Amino acid sequence: MRPVLVLDLDGTLALGDAPVLGYARAIETLAPYADGLTATVEAFLAEPGADARLRNAQDGYQAVQMLSEELGVDGALRNHAYALSRASLDVDLGDVRAPSGLAAALSELDAHRVLVTNSPRDGLDTLLGHLGVADLVDEIRTDAGKPRGMRPLLVGLLDDHGIAADPARLLSVGDIWANELAPALELGCATAYVDTFDRQQGPAHVRARTLPELYPAIREWARHPAEFVRAHPLPAGVPAGTATERPGLDI
């Protein structure tokens, strides 16, 4: 049985500020009382530690959520704005780019590669083609509803691939700890944390500021999942199969 590699999209496979700024602009269009949101998000992306209100934001999307909630924007409007912004990627990808060496890293792995994203399907094919990975993803799960939807999704993958009794054969890779890593840890899966802003929100088997820094560890896991988990134990006091709950995105 091949191991299963679960990959996040935004902030993990897809870098660049255009999508999140498009999301902020869509909120401003739908809710004029949120004027100034995009400018504040741009400032956060330029200097993540400058705004005390956003010290816990792990990426631009969480910054948008926190700021828009403060401005009185409700979840339904945010979700609508998000869907509009993702559809616009079919027209303009802006500065979106793949991490260095992504296609080569994925192509050499003997693993079932699953993309799991909160994004809708609209605009996704164009985006994956632009990133050079359209033919390197074996399965796509959209509208995943992370964080709440991640655990049942992972349980399904473990069952579907016959590895429920050996969950270390599934590696979850992502940049939002509550969304991609906490649910995986609860199930005993392997984890790789792309901690872009060095927030250190929770434990993981391996952690780095960028995905390319994690390529060697991902290759190591794909070759020998059980040995990988033994070689990269979780921090003392954090046994596998537990996680501290933290709210994630509502999109």
Model segments located where?
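An amphipathic alpha-helix signature
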Residues: 20-28, 61-65, 121
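Short, surface-exposed acidic
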Residues: 31-42, 72-83, 135-136, 167
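Alpha-helix N-cap/helix-initiation sites
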Residues: 16, 20, 34, 57, ...
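Asp-based, Mg2+/Mn2+-dependent phosphohydrolase catalytic module
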Residues: 1-3, 103-107, 111-114, 119-251
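Membrane interface segments of multi-pass transport proteins and intramembrane proteases
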Residues: 95-98
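Active-site neighborhood of HAD-like aspartate-dependent phosphohydrolases
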Residues: 1-46
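A metal-dependent, Asp-based hydrolase signature
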Residues: 42-90, 100, 104-107
